[in-house]
Amino acid sequence: MNRGRSMATPGEQCAGLRVWNQTEQEPAAYHLLSLCFVRAASSWVPPMYLWVLGPIYLLYIHRHGRCYLRMSHLFKTKMVLGLALILLYTFNVAVPLWRIHQGVPQAPELLIHPTVWLTTMSFATFLIHMERRKGVRSSGVLFGYWLLCCILPGINTVQQASAGNFRQEPLHHLATYLCLSLVVAELVLSCLVDQPPFFSEDSQPLNPCPEAEASFPSKAMFWWASGLLWRGYKKLLGPKDLWSLGRENSSEELVSQLEREWRRSCNGLPGHKGHSSVGAPETEAFLQPERSQRGPLLRAIWRVFRSTFLLGTLSLVISDAFRFAVPKLLSLFLEFMGDRNSSAWTGWLLAVLMFAAACLQTLFEQQHMYRAKVLQMRLRTAITGLVYRKVLVLSSGSRKSSAAGDVVNLVSVDIQRLAESIIYLNGLWLLFLWIFVCFVYLWQLLGPSALTAVAVFLSLLPLNFFITKKRGFHQEEQMRQKASRARLTSSMLRTVRTIKSHGWEHAFLERLLHIRGQELSALKTSTLLFSVSLVSFQVSTFLVALVVFAVHTLVAEDNAMDAEKAFVTLTVLSILNKAQAFLPFSVHCIVQARVSFDRLAAFLCLEEVDPNGMIASNSRRSSKDRISVHNGTFAWSQESPPCLHGINLTVPQGCLLAVVGPVGAGKSSLLSALLGELLKVEGSVSIEGSVAYVPQEAWVQNTSVVENVCFRQELDLPWLQKVLDACALGSDVASFPAGVHTPIGEQGMNLSGGQKQRLSLARAVYKKAAIYLLDDPLAALDAHVSQQVFKQVIGPSGLLQGTTRILVTHTLHVLPQADRILVLANGTIAEMGSYQDLLQRNGALVGLLDGARQPAGTHDAATSDDLGGFPGGGRPTCRPDRPRPTEAAPVKGRSTSEVQMEASLDDPEATGLTAEEDSVRYGRVKTTIYLSYLRAVGTPLCTYTLFLFLCQQVASFSQGYWLSLWADDPVVDGRQMHAALRGWVFGLLGCLQAIGLFASMAAVFLGGARASGLLFRSLLWDVARSPIGFFERTPVGNLLNRFSKETDTVDVDIPDKLRSLLTYAFGLLEVGLAVTMATPLAIVAILPLMVLYAGFQSLYVATSCQLRRLESARYSSVCSHMAETFQGSLVVRAFRAQASFTAQHDALMDENQRVSFPKLVADRWLATNLELLGNGLVFVAATCAVLSKAHLSAGLVGFSVSAALQVTQTLQWVVRSWTDLENSMVAVERVQDYARIPKEAPWRLPTCAAQPLWPCGGQIEFRDFGLRHRPELPLAVQGVSLKIHAGEKVGIVGRTGAGKSSLAWGLLRLQEAAEGNIWIDGVPITHVGLHTLRSRITIIPQDPVLFPGSLRMNLDLLQEHTDEGIWAALETVQLKAFVTSLPGQLQYECAGQGDDLSVGQKQLLCLARALLRKTQILILDEATASVDPGTEMQMQAALERWFTQCTVLLIAHRLRSVMDCARVLVMDEGQVAESGSPAQLLAQKGLFYRLAHESGLA
């Protein structure tokens, strides 16, 4: 009979239908595979593959096609090769037809096979053409087809040639080789990428992601990312090295899609009217939602991301199919090893199939993980953008129900939890399928004995849930202590000036360390329970196996234990164990994600600003009225009562309307109503023209001065200079280190309160708006600056003349210059008219003026512009040799400051920055950091831990080896003689492993807790001992990051990563030992694999560490921008800057994604390549076993191969654990950063020059005293020599930046003297410890400070006084009745920093605290500047009663406060300009007289 005529045509007819034909005699010993099997597979598998997937693929590219590709040389070559294959197969079809026509009988298969291949090749060529039409540059379907066409027919061709079948027909021989060559060429070409489309929709980015240019094999194994990993290995990665973000991953695209679907889902909600209208009660509305609102958000997310999720799910299902194929193949392989008569080709085939199944499982699983991680990234981006856009439209009522920290918590915690849950969603149903398949496998292997596995498995589940519940209780306790510690640490760092001024560091350190001790105690208990949980997970496979083996061997009739039963059971139980551990974890993560999802949905449903609350127009109509309110009634939210009633108001063009009234009258609410921020109950509001708004509490961004003022408008340099000079900022900016490019820090930390308010005013003025709404912008300015700003900006001749201005003010002396005055009382308009008209009416305005009880022109609520100036208090930025101008006239021509500003604009880096940026670490972590951590753990404990890990791994190895010996025991009459002994020893080894595992893990966690405690104590001590200048240069956020995030990393992450690294590393050694012991020949292949492993590890670790650090830094900027926008959303809306802020947020998110995407790709690159290496180790173990079959037992082979099967995960987790550990070790490095900074003087001196009762008199003497706030700055105080007598009351006055507060700082040694010294009662203060000095002086600052804790703790931090003494002090400051009315009285818990108390009440409590100290020296640093006149009178009365015999230094802006002082010091440019009694200084008509004249006192 004629032989086959095609590449797939059989060389001879098969004997029957069995492809595993063992009756057919093999032609030669070197034939490894059954010819019948190979012929069948090569004939039908490739065509079936393409006809199943081809139509689906064709439909997909038809729906998702892009622009067609160029007719490139690659495409032409593919088509030519395809047509050549069609011609060859046409020839193969024609030959049998011609022979039939000639009367030569032909077997049907000789015609069917070539015909099938002809149609299949035609279809493949058609797909090549359609791919070009639809823009497909690399095809996975065709790559798989050509690969199958190469492998299966290739094997058939080799066997046909080796059997000599081609010698009979040379022509067929040549045709077959030609076909195979063409297919190989097609395979090679499918590994290449075609040219980009003709008309690309997207512009080409600078550094495009190479994924688009990658071939299918490169995409499957993530080789396209190798370039970035190589760059990261060779050098430090920078922003230019990161790939540009594709449009499909950009914030603009993702957020717009989700927002569109979210609005669509919300349209169906009852009561929805185009914007969210869910009420916002005055509670944590979105933290504890009363009803679930997740439905619309869930539908929106599903519509946007379902295709990506479903494709990833399909990859996971296929991966699991191959996962369960491996145990079946292992079973067949061990059966082959146990059968000495089996053919060699069976072993080779099974080894190849195990390797192929493991590789396919790896590739599909990693594709699932890749898509899941990309989906996580996209979901996080989309929901974060949705939350940000919601922040920009939140109503005032909704904002009151939340805080910036809550929103940041949504972004950093809840969105992260929701994104992470994507991976676990499929676990809710797929794990049950795992469990079912595992039990089916066990039943096939062990029969009814497998039911015991069910019993043990079910009994372990309650144990895990119990441990999880108990651990959760201790974790909650740890979180409570951590929250308490965080609150106290934050309060301590934000009020460090007050703490150091009073010498309270020890008290706070003791409180913090006590809380820290409780936190670590809960952490230790939690980690010990975690160790038990981990041991139960690790040992559960052993427990189930022990019970199953014992029942099977001791109860069942056929109780022989062989290698197949033993090691296949262990492999299946390993899969079952993963399901057992993963299931509760998945449920826990999904439950947490559900809570977070509810919080997010509730937040997104909060009440928004009513778009119909105000009718705004930029058109200029004929009406002269810019603002019109008709019968307006407004409320903060739907639940709250109206705050404004019956408002009827019209403001014409160019009018200056002053709004006054008592506290709580509704002045700020009126401005909010005009801005559309309040809920309009009835009436109408109309505004014609653009609006600029200045809030009462200045809001500034963490950017430069020029960016704050320009506020996303084009830079107009002359106008900018004019605005800065008019707002009294010109000289300030000129003295800043980097001029207008000087960063002002987080929340304006580098500026004083007055500077921030003037910057806020400058921002509004720069806009050139038609309407200005000014909410008491003069309150934070001293009298002189207030007058200057009003005259040059707000007043009739200021920059805003001709615009419509509504000025809310408590500065009553400006009222005569207002065009109209509106007096509010209890939310209604009491009266309105000109100043003279209202005086004649003798109404509400006259009552306000009489109630002020101060001369006209006195500033009523000024706050110090001196404390906290840039960069530290005392305004060091104003140089002493530059006199501060008393009036800033409009600039003509090019002034010096304008030239300086222009120079700074040209070179923003010329003078450097002031605040210390939180640095991003680059490169590898130094060895010294690891050694410092290990020293904190303790050398003995480290050695003991390594010994325990070694012992438990020896027990694990012995357990597997003993099981192999058990499986190899001879079977006599269906039984093994020593089965009982084998079982007892197997159980004993498992118990020893469990004990060693628990002990080793507990040692790691307890050692980590010990190291964390020591490192935290060291960090706390280093920060507490730092001088005040360190806190002025270092943002509070940086410090809090060390005490929160970095400390948490040291607490939890480092011990866990170290435990993981040691576990996997020792496990990897066990696998290597098992494989080499069973087949020593494997060492030849293992060594090259280890070289590749080391190479992958080096590339990954170097790059991943850098990417993770960059990602952390980028994401923190997103959170900071979110919090900043939340705090200033009212200003953003008033300036109509929502679009630019949204664009900035999207840009920040995109920058974060530019780091996140390479990071997740690098993770997949590592996992794929290391798992493929692990699969290679399995293949090596199996092939070596086949080669050494003659002298290897099945039990030893099972031990070796089953151990190798577990190494695929172990390889990548060793590297990941090492990388995670290195990333976490950065926290140790950052925690130790502050150990090297200079420390302040000792708190206590062993030989102190002061007596126990020092100072007994209170005499203070300055001798040539000079002080500078930073080494590079000029002297803020210089050449001060004066003596203050005991018991003398001295006032200290001067303009802003004159050095008033600097004298107090020098007296308390908050800043050390640059020259000279200060003596108190004849003792130099440098000879006294800081705490000794500061505890003997009392200072009452301008800003009252309270701390989290009870009222009693706030009054007596050192616990030195009795309750009776505290009540007496409270009675003196007239707060006894108030405190008595509080719940708990002295034990009343203050919220935050006394947020539930008024400013006046907090200041009186600070005064009571000062009374309890009973020191001889008292410093009042503008202590009454921010309180109302009534509170000021109370404070003055208490001071006169308690401090009559004390030396009092009264620092004041308001000269009225120092008129009763015995002596007044007038500071000017850091020197004492004048000194004498108030009457003498007024008579001299010098600087004091000019200040008094400006304040209306002379």
From Swiss-Prot:
GO molecular function terms attached to this record: ABC-type glutathione S-conjugate transporter activity; ABC-type xenobiotic transporter activity; ATP binding; ATP hydrolysis activity; ATPase-coupled transmembrane transporter activity; inorganic diphosphate transmembrane transporter activity
Binding site for ATP 2: G1294, R1295, T1296, G1297, A1298, G1299, K1300, S1301
Catalytic reaction(s) noted: an S-substituted glutathione(in) + ATP + H2O = an S-substituted glutathione(out) + ADP + phosphate + H(+); leukotriene C4(in) + ATP + H2O = leukotriene C4(out) + ADP + phosphate + H(+)
Membrane topology: Multi-pass membrane protein
Glycosylation sites: N21, N341
SUPFAM superfamilies named among the record's database cross-references: ABC transporter transmembrane region, P-loop containing nucleoside triphosphate hydrolases
Gene3D superfamilies according to UniProt: ABC transporter type 1, transmembrane domain, P-loop containing nucleotide triphosphate hydrolases
Biological processes annotated in GO: ATP metabolic process; ATP transport; calcium ion homeostasis; gene expression; inhibition of non-skeletal tissue mineralization; inorganic diphosphate transport; intracellular phosphate ion homeostasis; leukotriene transport
Residues annotated as domain ABC transmembrane type-1: 309-592, 942-1223
Subcellular location: Basolateral cell membrane; Basal cell membrane
Predominant location category: membrane
EC number(s) on file: 7.6.2.-, 7.6.2.3
Binding site for ATP 1: G661, P662, V663, G664, A665, G666, K667, S668
Extracellular side stretches: 1-37, 100-104, 156-173, 322-347, 446-448, 553-574, 956-992, 1078, 1192-1193
Span list, region Disordered: 855-910
One cellular component term from this protein's GO annotations in UniProt: basolateral plasma membrane
Phosphoserine sites (modified residues): S1281
CDD domains: ABC_6TM_MRP1_2_3_6_D1_like, ABC_6TM_MRP1_2_3_6_D2_like, ABCC_MRP_domain1, ABCC_MRP_domain2
PTM (free text): Glycosylated.
Domain ABC transporter: 627-851, 1260-1494
Superkingdom field: Eukaryota
Cytoplasmic compartment residues: 59-78, 126-137, 195-300, 369-424, 470-531, 596-934, 1014-1056, 1100-1170, 1215-1498
PANTHER family listed in its UniProt record: ATP-BINDING CASSETTE SUB-FAMILY C, ATP-BINDING CASSETTE SUB-FAMILY C MEMBER 6
Family: Belongs to the ABC transporter superfamily. ABCC family. Conjugate transporter (TC 3.A.1.208) subfamily.
Protein name, per record: ATP-binding cassette sub-family C member 6
Lineage of producing organism: Eukaryota, Metazoa, Chordata, Craniata, Vertebrata
